[in-house]
Amino acid sequence: DQTSIIKYIERKYYEDLLDELPVLNDYVEKLSKKYKKEEVEYDKVAELFYNIYREMTVHIETEQSDVYPLLLTYYEENSDAAYEALKPHITRLLDEHKNIVHWFKQIRSLTNGYTPVDSNEPLNVFVMKKLEENEDNIMT
């Protein structure tokens, strides 16, 4: 049923993302500071990832507090009024998703496909790997 699907999405994606995004944001900032002089694009990567972190956090909170209750009402009532109440929220969430996709594309470009500038440096390798994993997880 619909409630089970929503609970599955929250467990499978949202809980992990809400745990991981702030930690990864800290690591991205550390990487940016470490390579500030040699790799100036890492400053932009840090800025873009902070945008993703902020947008995803708000996105998830909005879905849980506003969209899911409206969605369940729509499934229960299947009425035009429930659909109209839900529609602007869905439009906004789709716009947020487009922003996130755009920011990840920029990060991918700035990092040459998430290629570490120093493959012998664990922080660099870790951050690039986690950025790519997050892009994959968010895009699916």
Where is each model-derived feature located?
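Small-residue-biased structural context
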Residues: 1-139
